[in-house]
Amino acid sequence: MQVFQVEGVHLRADTALEGATQHSVYHPDSLHQPQPDWLAEEVPVALVYNGISHVVMMASPKELELFALGFSLSEGIIQSPADIYGIDVLPACNGIEVQIELSSRRFAGLKERRRAMDGRTGCGVCGVEQLAEIGKPVSPLPFTQTFSLSKLENALVRLRDVQKIGQVTGCTHAASWVAPDGTLCGGSEDVGRHVALDKLLGARAKQEWQQGAALVSSRASYEMVQKSAMCGVEILFAVSAATSLAVEVAQRCNLTLVGFCRPGHATIYTHPQRLSE
């Protein structure tokens, strides 16, 4: 029986792990002898607002209530969790449907936004209907947060603990909220980096984490900067690089963006005044 290790605990190959499934694989030294291995699950998830399907995303089938909340906030569909009256996660044809009940005011705003897009030619950029939606205006963030880079090292070491699926599949991204003292308050993982961030933003809103910063295991794209800024996150740390558009958006909305985060190293792209050694 093959054994895997998650958070120091041995995990048998026949153990259930939410968001992962088993599959027989072959290795060069045993091409005729299959062995069990773990694969991260990836399923289509439809977000349905008041009975109207809004978007379908590929995601890990876990923490979907947090995903729905975080996506709704980061896309400006709602202003606060109170704008959502209920969330139901239901199996659907070849995937999962997340039914979200919006307040009448927010649903009216969503319908108006969708009507404004009708008849426009899609540009094919991440499902956005027109190029003007890329880098859409975000209110400039205040400068209320500070963070010591020396406290980030503990969070970087502990980030892998968030990736229970990733530890046995090597196939997920992580997003965590880091308190000013370097403690990981919580985190999420997903096969999609944007979905992992949305799940974290949902958890942050639910838990009302205010002080601290977001840390992601991936690169920082413009979408991740924009989503963070929409939710009032002032500092975003990324393990990998940032794109040029991400830096442009971060500069414009006053977000402190830091890439290549490693113990003892970081590249600060924008607004370093929030940071100290």
Curated annotation (Swiss-Prot):
<comment type="similarity">
    <text>Belongs to the FdhD family.</text>
</comment>
<dbReference type="GO" id="GO:0097163">
    <property type="term" value="F:sulfur carrier activity"/>
</dbReference>
<keyword id="KW-0963">Cytoplasm</keyword>
<dbReference type="InterPro" id="IPR016193">
    <property type="entry name" value="Cytidine_deaminase-like"/>
</dbReference>
<protein>
    <recommendedName>
        <fullName>Sulfur carrier protein FdhD</fullName>
    </recommendedName>
</protein>
<keyword id="KW-0501">Molybdenum cofactor biosynthesis</keyword>
<feature type="active site" description="Cysteine persulfide intermediate">
    <location>
        <position position="123"/>
    </location>
</feature>
<dbReference type="GO" id="GO:0005737">
    <property type="term" value="C:cytoplasm"/>
</dbReference>
<dbReference type="InterPro" id="IPR003786">
    <property type="entry name" value="FdhD"/>
</dbReference>
<dbReference type="GO" id="GO:0006777">
    <property type="term" value="P:Mo-molybdopterin cofactor biosynthetic process"/>
</dbReference>
<dbReference type="Pfam" id="PF02634">
    <property type="entry name" value="FdhD-NarQ"/>
</dbReference>
<comment type="function">
    <text>Required for formate dehydrogenase (FDH) activity. Acts as a sulfur carrier protein that transfers sulfur from IscS to the molybdenum cofactor prior to its insertion into FDH.</text>
</comment>
<dbReference type="GO" id="GO:0016783">
    <property type="term" value="F:sulfurtransferase activity"/>
</dbReference>
